[in-house]
Amino acid sequence: TGLFKDVDLDIQAYRPFLVYLNSEFWGLYNLREKVNEHFIGSHHPVDPEEIDLIEVQTANQGTTNNYNELINYVSESDMTDPAIFDFLSEWIDIDNHIDYNVAQIFIDNRDWPGNNIKYWRPQLDDGKWRWILYDTDFGFGVPWMGGGYNVNTLEFAVEANGPNWPNPPWSTFLFRKLLENSSYQKRFINVFCDRLNTIFDSGYMINRLDSMALNIQDVIPNHQNKWPDSAIDWDYHVQVIRTFAEYRPEYMRNYLESFFDLSNLVQSRFYSTTGGNIQINTIIPDSYPWVGEYYEDIPISVKAIPDSGFTFVGWPQYPDSGASMNIPVYEDFNLTSFFTSYLGGDTIDLVINEINYHSLDSFNTGDWIE
């Protein structure tokens, strides 16, 4: 789940650690946050005693009443109606729900969605439902599930007549219904593209894997000596994950294109002058030009974000548009944002070390800034 640390998801912090009992080596373990109401309270400005937290279909904290009302409303509503979707956007954290499903589908977690699913809301009139990403050890090509990088987990996640485990009908219902709405559908596609352009990039994932493996590989032999049935074929399993990271993006694009009848994946280039950034859907690039791939059929959202001391001037390609806009992408698409300083020249980083104001009458050193 560490792959999603910068995404709008609730994930457990963790670290590998070595255990010694009375100076005897006891193995390599993972220390993780426990997902309960206190986990929610430590990550959000809410009272942990005043939330609804559901695991699978049972309330661990609070009740299931509000969620049951949500499901009843969805089942009785026309999800193609924009007004219905706008209303649901006040009931569900839509961005979180999209990111959650994108994550589970991409990693091919098939011990879900009828299991290992927790979701919560503050018990407030405007409290929105959010989903927690945890226990994803069936993902990334786990051998005993078969397949992995070539499994169409998107179809799996919308199966209307699945078995009791792992994807029964109740567990896929909300996602299936939301996908009937064109606004949700387009946002889902764009977020998937955002992730494929960034954290789902093969090179990025393999670098993270290699870093994590390097961090613990020296202790694996000692762990195996202590627990002979643990970490069997460790190098092989690391390679399974590496293979998944290498091939999964291409397969996932194919599944998106087939499911949503998409065509014309185009390369888009974004440029920004000194003094600001461009937010592309959910991404704010670290450097420019930034290149991403998006579908010609699906408009993207862009927003010019000026740095302190700068103001947005405009887009040469869209001179009549403001700082935020939704635009189509097309072959050889380029977009540039222009910023200018409003301080009449180059800006500098100013550091104030000391301020003295209104000294005591008995020791008046004047007012000064240093």
Language model features with spans:
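Middle-to-C-terminal accessory/interaction subdomains
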Residues: 6, 16-20, 25-29, 40, ...
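Low-complexity, Pro/Thr/Ser/Gly/Ala-rich linker/spacer regions in secreted
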Residues: 257-267, 338-349
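Conserved N-terminal submotifs of small, disulfide-stabilized extracellular modules
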Residues: 264-292
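Short, solvent-exposed S/T- and G/P-enriched segments that are highly enriched in secreted/extracellular
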Residues: 282-299, 321-327
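Surface-exposed interfaces of beta-sheet-rich extracellular modules
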Residues: 299-323
